[in-house]
From Swiss-Prot:
Cofactor note: Binds at least 14 chlorophylls (8 Chl-a and 6 Chl-b) and carotenoids such as lutein and neoxanthin.
Biological source species: Arabidopsis thaliana (Mouse-ear cress)
Family: Belongs to the light-harvesting chlorophyll a/b-binding (LHC) protein family.
Stated induction or repression of this protein's expression: Induced by low light (LL) but repressed by high light (HL). Inhibited by cold.
Residue range covered by the transit peptide: 1-35
Binding site residues for chlorophyll a 4: N194
Membrane topology: Multi-pass membrane protein
Binding site for chlorophyll b 3: E153
PTM field: Photoregulated by reversible phosphorylation of its threonine residues.
A GO CC term assigned to this protein in UniProt: photosystem I
InterPro entries, alphabetized: Chloro_AB-bd_pln, Chloroa_b-bind
Protein name per Swiss-Prot or TrEMBL: Chlorophyll a-b binding protein 6, chloroplastic
Lineage: Eukaryota, Viridiplantae, Streptophyta, Embryophyta, Tracheophyta
Length: 241
């Protein structure tokens, strides 16, 4: 009996088409077949590093969750929710910052490093794309930003639903993407992935500027492409002289 069952399993594994008929004698062998639920669970179990166990508190339900938490920072549920929110907010800021750095430099209006030099001058006037910014002195801008950000953060902190704090919808969804739940979940994953890429890009801009002070990312890239063997990160990290 056992040998018959094993033979049935072996044949079914090699010739799965034999199971397609409801009259097949191999159906009674109870061979488990993959189904949509199993495939979904397999995808959910994707790890950030093969062989590393997924923490129990990272179950794959959050957008972009691949079980990455080597320091165990999210073990406390309240902290985990706060980190999710903080990551998303920082991702959105980075996605605004990276194009804001690249586009003006690409248009020939200077780089983001030199754009800050006015703030170091007494009575310096801020400009944007060559035009003076109204109320563009440093103390005035700091006061406006402090009041504006304080108001927005206060309003956001009053929301008790963690999902609404991250995805408020309403006026922040003018195209109505949140009306389709399936589409919304897909967009959440795309947002967090693009946001993480933008965070890495901004860190790269900062490192590049520290290595080559006064240069923007596009200028630095052009210099590297002109002579890749001599203009690279190794030229700074490894002291040749």
């Amino acid at each position: 009996m056992a040998s018959n069952s094993l033979m049935s399993c072996g044949i079914a594994a090699v010739y799965p088409s034999l199971l397609s008929s409801s009259k097949s004698k191999f159906v009674s062998a109870g061979v488990p077949l993959p189904n949509a639920g199993n495939v979904g669970r397999i995808r959910m179990a994707a790890h950030w590093m093969p062989g590393e166990p997924r923490p129990a508190y990272l179950d794959g339900s959050a957008p972009g969750d691949f079980g990455f938490d080597p320091l165990g920072l999210g073990e406390v549920p309240a902290n985990l929710e706060r980190y999710k929110e903080s990551e998303l907010i920082h991702c959105r800021w980075a996605m605004l910052a990276v194009p804001g750095i690249l586009v003006p430099e690409a248009l020939g209006y200077g780089n983001w490093v030199k754009a800050q030099e006015w703030a170091a001058l007494p009575g310096g006037q801020a400009t944007y794309l060559g035009n003076p910014v109204p109320w563009g002195t440093l103390p005035t801008i700091l006061a406006i930003e402090f009041l504006a950000i304080a108001f927005v953060e206060h309003q956001r902190s009053m929301e008790k639903d963690p999902e609404k704090k991250k995805y408020p919808g309403g006026a922040f969804d003018p195209l109505g993407y949140s009306k389709d739940p399936k589409k919304l979940e897909e967009l959440k994953v795309k947002e967090i992935k693009n946001g993480r890429l933008a965070l890495l890009a901004f860190v790269g801009f900062c490192v590049q500027q520290s290595a080559y002070p006064g240069t923007g990312p596009l200028e630095n890239l052009a210099t590297h492409l002109a002579d890749p063997w001599h203009n690279n990160i190794g030229d700074i990290v490894i002291p040749f002289n």
